[in-house]
């Protein structure tokens, strides 16, 4: 299910590794995918991009790879892990 562009912008800025990433603001998933596949310089950035792209269109095969929650949680630093866990808690409470 696609969410609004504003929702993705709001979520994207919670992941510091994506602050200057192309495709986050304004939201452009194709641009973010290319950046994550070719130019992202650390695991925080790649896993954060994969997470957003998976939320946007889960069935698509993104160039940067599929989001793996277990791998991301192991690789993310504390700030990025917290951003994900905060999102997960909000989604759980909304259901």
Residue ranges and their predicted role:
Residues 1, 90-95:
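Short intrinsically disordered terminal tails
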Residues 1-34:
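Short terminal alpha-helical segments
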Residues 6, 48, 71, 93-94:
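Residue-level detector of intrinsically disordered, flexible termini
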Residues 13, 20, 56, 81, ...:
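Short linear sequence elements within intrinsically disordered, low-complexity coil regions
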Residues 32-87:
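Amphipathic protein-protein interaction modules
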């Amino acid at each position: 299910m696609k969410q609004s562009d504003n929702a993705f912008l709001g979520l994207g800025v919670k992941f510091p590794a994506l602050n200057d990433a192309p495709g986050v603001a304004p939201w452009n998933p194709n641009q973010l995918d290319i950046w994550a596949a070719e130019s992202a310089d650390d695991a925080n950035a790649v896993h954060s991009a994969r997470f957003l792209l998976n939320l946007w269109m889960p069935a698509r095969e993104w160039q940067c790879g599929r989001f793996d929650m277990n791998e991301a949680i192991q690789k993310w630093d504390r700030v990025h892990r917290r951003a994900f866990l905060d999102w997960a808690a909000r989604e759980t409470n909304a259901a």
